[in-house]
Amino acid sequence: MSLCTLEINLSAIKNNYLLLQDICKTSLVGAAVKANGYGLGAVQISKALIEENCRHFFVASSEEGVNLRKALASWHESVFRHCEKNYTVIRRSNPVKNSVSQNFFNYFSGLQQCFAPRNDGSSIHATTPKALDNDVNILVLNGVFEHDALELIEYNLTPVLNNLKQIEIWQKFSNLKNRLLPCYLHFNTGINRLGLTHNEIEQLINNRDLLKGLDLQYIISHLAVSEEIDNPYNLEQLNRFKTYLQYFPNVKASLANSGGIFLGQDYHFDLARPGAALYGLNPVIDLSNNLSYKEEFEGDTERRTAAYINVREDSSTGSTYKLPLEGGYSRGLQNPVTLKAPIIHLQNLTLDSHIGYNMTFTTERDSVIATLPLGYADGFSRNFSNQGEVFINGRSVPIVGRISMDLINIDVTDLPPLDIFLGQEAEIIGNYCTPDKIASIIGTIGYEVLTSLGSRYKRIYK
């Protein structure tokens, strides 16, 4: 068993989702859970967000989609059977008192209709776990390929089609199955990675038969610099996207990623698809600075206070919106991740002692050095050598020497003696040192910090 623990606070992720939904108002909010939910657990996160009425989950590949669908199908089966067995108990009393959480009950409140008598008074009827499962949309961002098309159909996955070849493949399997197949189209408006090009979009506009057999549910695009609020390229992409959408007036649209949500309602359309912001990462550069506005609003079950920054005007409505400040739900986005490692070795070193590979650190005094059981094999970058920090009881402790595959050394000399003992936990990631802060030390982004978290940690969901 791993000595290190990675705690993922699902309540924090839920709260981040609810905050984003508040900002998006009437637009739907989905969730990017690709790369195993940014390293935090796609299945667990999806279940938690389903309880908050999230119904759109974005993965990168068909493999990720199949794994998620299988897990959710199994969960829906168990939940359905639980409700079927305990429906009478649930109906007659407060569900919370019967070991059924309020969120759990709310999500499956539709089952009241499934198990209720028909209007004509005839026998009780029920839906199926499959019907519950089909209510959850799993979108595959990389699209469809010949080798996985049947798998997408079998597991009810919706591909985001990125070029005419993928459209052709999906149309071929539509003909094979003799039914409409659901899809999203991705229009490239300037990020120049995936997405139909301008010439390909013109072909679709001029020849709608290219989409025959396809159930086109959404048209999406992706912003290149949404974290830079004042970058004019955001508006360029928005205008390009709107121009294309004029030719598809009855199709829903999605543009905003995490940063796009904070660009204003012009960017929200029918569906936003945040990733980073769900996991407590700053979606906008300098988001946590310049507190300037405070607003109270009424939630469904409680009164919340949210602090915001940088009041901006929405060009489409003339109304203002506010950007949330880091730090706890009542102040904005929460960090849901805490990584802890215990001290497994202590030693007293004299002045001029060398530490770690290649002797990159030399003590400048008599020192107490502690060793923690994690390293670059666990996603803790070697770039933290001699420049990172951890926290013990809220006190900063420097990393000394090279990060090795499985171990790091820290200098605990300045800690109170009572805080220095074998088994004492050091906080590697947490509220003292968020993924964004860690990323800034080594010149990367919080996304990379989270997705690099290794498989050897004991993961605890709360």
Curated annotation (Swiss-Prot):
Query: What are the transmembrane regions?
Result: none
Keyword Isomerase belongs to the record:
yes
Q: Which residues form the active site?
A: 34 (proton acceptor), 357 (proton acceptor)
**Which residue numbers delimit the RPE1 insert domain?**
286-332
- Top enzyme class: isomerase
Q: Which GO terms describe its molecular function?
A: alanine racemase activity; pyridoxal phosphate binding
Q: Which UniProt keywords apply?
A: Isomerase, Pyridoxal phosphate
Pathway where this protein functions: Amino-acid biosynthesis; D-alanine biosynthesis; D-alanine from L-alanine: step 1/1
Which prosthetic group or cofactor does it need? pyridoxal 5'-phosphate
EC number(s) on file? 5.1.1.1
GO cellular component, as recorded:
cytosol
Question: Region Unknown insert: what ranges?
Answer: 73-132
One Gene Ontology term from the biological process aspect of the record = D-alanine biosynthetic process
Question: Which HAMAP family does this chain map to?
Answer: Ala_racemase
Q: What does this protein do?
A: Catalyzes the interconversion of L-alanine and D-alanine. May also act on other amino acids.
| Sequence similarity | Belongs to the alanine racemase family.
Protein name from the UniProt record = Alanine racemase
The source organism is Rickettsia felis (strain ATCC VR-1525 / URRWXCal2) (Rickettsia azadi)
